[in-house]
Amino acid sequence: MSRYKKMFQKLSFLKEGCFVPFVVIGDPSLEMSLKIIETLIENGADALELGIPFSDPLADGPIIQKASLRALYKKNTFLQCFELIENIRNKYLHLPIGILLYANLVYNYGIKNFYYQCFRSGLDSVLIADIPIEEYEPFYKIANQYNINSIFICPPDADDSLLSKISLYAKGYIYLLSRPGVTGIEKKTISLSNIFIEKIKKYNSLPLLQGFGIENPTQIQKSILSGTNGVICGSAIIDIIEKNLNKEKKMINEIKNFTSKLKKATKFVQS
Amino acid sequence: MTLLNPYFGKFGGMYVPQILMPALYQLEKNFVDAKKDSNFQKSFFNYLKNYAGRPTPLTLCNNLTNGTKTRIYLKREDLLHGGAHKTNQVLGQAMLAVKMKKKEIIAETGAGQHGVAAAIASALFNLKCKIYMGYKDIKRQSPNVFRMKLMGAEVVSVESGSGTLKDACNEALRDWSRNYQKSHYMIGTAAGPHPYPTIVKEFQKMIGEEAKKQILEQENRLPDAIIACVGGGSNAIGIFSDFIDEDVNLIGVEPAGQGIETGKHGAPLNHGRTGIYFGMKSHLMQSQEGQIEKSWSISAGLDFPSVGPEHSWLNSIHRAKYVSITDIEALEAFQILSKKEGIIPALESSHALAYALKLMYLDPKKEQVFIVNLSGRGDKDIFTVREILKKTEKKHESL
């Protein structure tokens, strides 16, 4: 059974939602990044979504973009990112770990080499932010050969034809977009309609995680009440990193508190 | 499923976040309908003729070629309303935006030529217009920024990354992924995700059609070569289009910037690798690790690390040849054309002209006919050129 499947089963048994934090590997440095990720895990992360830094992350807003540029500034290599993943994998054997990156990094490394590297590092899933399902075929085939789950993004206005395609291809979980646009914190409150979520569930039985704009416990509870299995939270965590770049202890402390608070929000019992 | 083939050989495609796919399908469908719609076509050609000023002339440069057997013709897109070929296709795209009932235009610009064109078309069709421009380009192209604002466009300064066209493109795509329901993203060149490269070529192909007719009238034969500058590649694909099936050399000129060996250039076709960026698979300036590299050119309009996918394809099948010209060579051509023929070319077009002159000087006795696409006029560049010339003069004085 895949790590995602086991994790979702366990959470469903415990009647908890899933909390997945997102950070960029190497932000602000490889060493700090490892500390941050361990803090996230120790304080309630049910799975990890890790970004591989890219120069032009056009699906991301300013907070994640700056994180990528901070990481790139350190000139860490692609393989060093994978070493860090391997490191975490060896320490946390059962934790589902996924990466999010951009097409050119995969293409440049060679699609086959890339997925082999993912497999070797103990990764569970890959999300390529700028490849829609229509262009996924060459990546999908090889991902399957190496048993890597391909994560697909479901926009809030997805029509029947897209929903049926996603249900055919998706593995692990489905990444539900809260809203159109790029990642980041926005003032507008976000909630997906129960009707839309029910419609997605008619097409497939995969767990649903909501991402984009998640930053507080109320949103998490609303998301789970609308029928999702949990949330992915990135920019709000990276915002803490950015604001405390020279205050390591404070940064770790704030991430610790924030993570516990958000994880706690997933634990309310559904009526 | 797309209605048209999104690929040129292995290049092209639709590499965008999933959220943008419906907007691309909608655009493609409206474009396909518009091509078949005689009213749309009639109206488009009416705007081209009576608003933009087509056909543009084909000018023979006698002074420039004096003492040689080369005849150089310029396709005068600089005389089009707006001062560059960009006006052609923005009229088409603005009409598509109206057809799709979009109220706003999002655009990005490097040299400001596409920004000006987008502002022109938006004013004409009563559309709100937001233009993303790198902060460095805003500085080096201030007259064009002023023009855009005069025509009611909002110019957004992009501070992220290198602060040039590449970053403006990212920002425009981000805006579009938030606002695609009400906004049309008016891409300025024959690049980006399908259907843009096909749409832009369709709305620029009259350059080639006119040039072919005009050269046959004036020379009674086709030219030996068509020479055009290539940033994203819209003016080049426009003038190439009607000659692709003819026995004519097609030459695209990329910016070699401060010299290919310095790394400060914008020549991905000759000095980049295939990659995926800005919605397409094409040639790309990238690091060993696959990070997109900053490009460089004296001409902001050519300062782009990638190129339209059809050019990558024409290059791969050896149908077109791509060469490069340095900043200095382009500057010389800029001055020569101004002095000899009384035509101030855009720094972009100066690259194409510089290569034509190079070929001419190489073999002055060879009888040959070239058409250079003079894609835009150089008014916008006179301040940049003045600054450089001042510096060079100072250098000479101190020697």
Swiss-Prot record, chain A:
- Report the GO terms under cellular component: cytosol
User: Which Pfam family is an annotated match for this chain, by its short name?
Assistant: Trp_syntA
Disulfide cross-links: none
Q: Which InterPro entries match?
A: Aldolase_TIM, RibuloseP-bd_barrel, Trp_synthase_alpha_AS, Trp_synthase_suA
Superkingdom of source: Bacteria
* Reactions catalysed according to its record: (1S,2R)-1-C-(indol-3-yl)glycerol 3-phosphate + L-serine = D-glyceraldehyde 3-phosphate + L-tryptophan + H2O
Is the keyword Translocase assigned to this protein?
Answer: no
GO molecular function list: tryptophan synthase activity
Task: From the UniProt record, give the pathway where this protein acts.
Answer: Amino-acid biosynthesis; L-tryptophan biosynthesis; L-tryptophan from chorismate: step 5/5
Output the CDD domains linked to this UniProt entry. Tryptophan_synthase_alpha
> What's in the keyword line of the UniProt record?
Amino-acid biosynthesis, Aromatic amino acid biosynthesis, Lyase, Tryptophan biosynthesis
Q: Which residues form the active site?
A: E49, D60
Enzyme Commission identifier(s): 4.2.1.20
Any keyword Repeat? Answer: no
Q: Which family does it belong to?
A: Belongs to the TrpA family.
Outline what the protein does.
The alpha subunit is responsible for the aldol cleavage of indoleglycerol phosphate to indole and glyceraldehyde 3-phosphate.
Name of the featured protein? Tryptophan synthase alpha chain
From Swiss-Prot, chain B:
Q: Which GO terms describe its cellular component?
A: cytoplasm
Question: What is the required cofactor set for this protein?
Answer: pyridoxal 5'-phosphate
Q: Per the record, a Pfam family?
A: PALP
GO MF, one example? tryptophan synthase activity
EC main class here is lyase
Query: Sites of the modification N6-(pyridoxal phosphate)lysine?
Result: K86
What SUPFAM superfamilies does the record tag this protein with? Answer: Tryptophan synthase beta subunit-like PLP-dependent enzymes
Q: Which InterPro entries has this protein been placed in?
A: Trp_synth_b_CS (IPR006653), Trp_synth_beta (IPR006654), Trp_synth_beta/beta-like (IPR023026), TrpB-like_PALP (IPR001926), TrpB-like_PALP_sf (IPR036052)
Q: Which Cys residues form disulphide pairs?
A: none
- Asked whether the UniProt record includes Oxidoreductase among its keywords, one would answer no
Q: Which family does it belong to?
A: Belongs to the TrpB family.
Q: How does it assemble?
A: Tetramer of two alpha and two beta chains.
**Protein name (Swiss-Prot/TrEMBL):** Tryptophan synthase beta chain
